[in-house]
Amino acid sequence: MALEEIQRDADEWIRKHTPGYFTPLMMLARLTEELGELSRAVSHHHGEKKPKPGEEKGNIQDEIGDLLFVLVCLANDLGISMDDAWRGLLRKLYERDVDRWKS
């Protein structure tokens, strides 16, 4: 699925099921919250800190999906094309950082 399609799907859902997008600062807070949930799930599955008794490990795939949804909503609200953002990142990696990670 292309990033443009993901953005369109998120926008359709927001328009049908909510009064609209949260403010950018609220979405940034939501991103932080979702990143924390992803961090906890990764830590529980792969880190030293295991879940407390009775606490679920969390589903890493689900947490990545939650994080992606909020990021896409932020991009939509700010009028940013995720495709353009991705192409810009790749250009930066291939031009500026092409030799940065070679051993």
Regions found by a protein language model. Name each.
Residues 1-64, 68-103:
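Flexible "arm" and connector segments at domain edges
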